[in-house]
């Protein structure tokens, strides 16, 4: 059933498309078929973003149904899921769990840093399978970002999207955090949309390339000033 009480801001739709969150894979499991809008010529499935949005709303309402944000644990064992998870936790007050999931973290209280969450959010039910199974043992519901090949066993709220893309995962955690803030505090969802950059993972090679491009742009700007300046202006640039 569609939840029409909260409309998707157009900028969110553009963000999901720009980060390719709407693109699934070639393999589609039976539970995920209902979230597919169509198929491209290369057999890649395309998600129905209207259904994705409805699941975003449902997940946000489940989060807001708890009295305290730290009752929720957000998990990602993926390298590129670390930054969006940490930023989401910072924004919403949830607990974060990144890197390798230690077996028994939810079921064995003698383990260091063990916790008893009332709700967990995972970036990939395949990679984060151990966390989902342990949550099920302690009757803790699970929200998961699910691709077309995901098995929804023990997943209570599946948000259908491309969870293999670092940009898509970052955008998805950003959107979910904005919906939660809107429901809790009435903060406009599309306010300061550029903050989505804070949720994006960038590997060291990409950061180095960006730095090189920036340095090159600065060099070109200075070079153009010198080449286009007359004698008087040249002196002003040098001693500015």
Curated annotation (Swiss-Prot):
Chief place of localization: cytoplasm
InterPro entries: Ribosomal_uS2, Ribosomal_uS2_euk, Ribosomal_uS2_euk/arc, Ribosomal_uS2_flav_dom_sf
UniProt subcellular location: Cytoplasm
Key words of the record: Cytoplasm, Ribonucleoprotein, Ribosomal protein
Gene3D superfamilies: Glucose-6-phosphate isomerase like protein, domain 1 (3.40.50.10490)
GO biological process assignments: ribosomal small subunit assembly; translation
Keyword Nuclease: no
Any single Gene Ontology cellular-component annotation: cytosolic small ribosomal subunit
Gene Ontology MF term list: structural constituent of ribosome
Domain of life where this protein originates: Eukaryota
Keyword Cell membrane: no
Family per record: Belongs to the universal ribosomal protein uS2 family.
Function: Required for the assembly and/or stability of the 40S ribosomal subunit. Required for the processing of the 20S rRNA-precursor to mature 18S rRNA in a late step of the maturation of 40S ribosomal subunits.
HAMAP family per UniProt: Ribosomal_S2_euk
Subunit structure, interactors included: Component of the small ribosomal subunit. Mature ribosomes consist of a small (40S) and a large (60S) subunit. The 40S subunit contains about 33 different proteins and 1 molecule of RNA (18S). The 60S subunit contains about 49 different proteins and 3 molecules of RNA (25S, 5.8S and 5S). Interacts with RPS21.
Annotated PANTHER family: 40S RIBOSOMAL PROTEIN SA (PTHR11489)
Protein name per the record: Small ribosomal subunit protein uS2
């Amino acid at each position: 059933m569609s939840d029409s009480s909260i409309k998707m801001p157009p900028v969110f739709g553009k963000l999901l498309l720009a980060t390719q969150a709407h693109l699934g894979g070639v393999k589609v499991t039976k539970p995920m078929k209902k979230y597919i809008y169509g198929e491209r010529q290369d057999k890649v499935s395309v998600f129905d973003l209207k259904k994705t949005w409805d699941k975003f709303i449902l997940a946000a309402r489940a989060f807001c149904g708890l009295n305290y944000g730290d009752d929720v644990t957000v998990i990602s064992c993926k390298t590129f899921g670390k930054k969006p998870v940490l930023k989401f936790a910072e924004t919403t007050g949830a607990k974060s769990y990144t890197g390798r999931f230690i077996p028994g973290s939810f079921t064995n209280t003698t383990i260091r840093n063990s916790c008893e969450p009332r709700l967990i959010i995972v970036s990939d039910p395949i990679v984060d399978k151990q966390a989902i199974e342990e949550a099920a043992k302690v009757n803790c519901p699970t929200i998961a970002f699910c691709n077309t090949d995901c098995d929804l066993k023990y997943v209570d709220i599946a948000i259908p999207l491309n969870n293999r893309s670092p940009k898509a995962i970052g955008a998805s955690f950003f959107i979910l955090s904005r919906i939660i803030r809107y429901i809790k505090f009435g903060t406009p969802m599309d306010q300061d949309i550029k903050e989505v950059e804070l949720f994006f993972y960038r590997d060291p090679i990409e950061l180095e390339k960006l730095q090189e491009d920036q340095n090159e742009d600065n060099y070109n700007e200075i070079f153009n000033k010198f080449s286009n300046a007359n004698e008087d202006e040249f002196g002003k640039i040098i001693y500015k």
